[in-house]
A protein has these predicted regions:
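Signature of the catalytic double-stranded beta-helix
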Residues: 1-46
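Short beta-strand-plus-loop segments that form exposed binding edges in beta-rich domains
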Residues: 131
């Protein structure tokens, strides 16, 4: 599945004007995230990678399986108008995801089956509690990181 999703990551990198001739991107650290009823993931970052990706495989039908929250840890947004750094670094994240909540440095992303979210690995992120009341309430996602290798000249 990562091989099928990785071309999307490469397109995002091109849109960010990354030089893919000098820098090769590789998919690493692939894992499955299963959030059962009442489970959640605490705030964290992914060190030693440049992009983090999550692809939604299954969500509860009542859509209460938990949201992905991406937070820019730099508190300058409290004093200045919101720059487009989150949008630019996440392949037009604003139009892909929808509205941003009232906290200008935080995005709330509602999962959808088949949706992939790509964001800079240094951004703090977490998953809110799975509050689904369904019998089959698991929220399942595939996650992976992307690293950069310098190409030999």
């Amino acid at each position: 599945l990562c091989q099928e999703l990785f071309p999307i990551v490469q397109e995002i990198s091109k849109s960010l004007k990354w030089d893919l001739e000098k820098n090769e991107l590789n998919c690493v650290d692939i894992w499955t995230v299963i959030n059962k009823k009442n489970s959640f993931n605490t705030s964290h970052i992914h060190k030693n990678s440049i992009l983090s990706c999550v692809y939604y495989l299954k969500i509860p039908k009542d859509k209460k399986g938990g949201n992905l929250i991406i937070k820019d840890p730099r508190n300058v947004w409290e004093f200045f108008p919101r720059p487009t750094v989150l949008e630019d670094c996440s392949y037009n994240l604003k139009s892909t995801i929808g509205s941003v909540n009232h906290n200008p440095n935080e995005l709330v992303i509602k999962p959808e089956v088949g949706k992939m979210i790509v964001f800079p690995s240094w951004l703090e992120h977490k998953v809110t509690q799975n509050l689904s009341e369904e019998k089959d309430s698991d929220r399942i996602a595939l996650a992976f990181n992307v690293i950069e290798n310098k190409c030999q000249q």
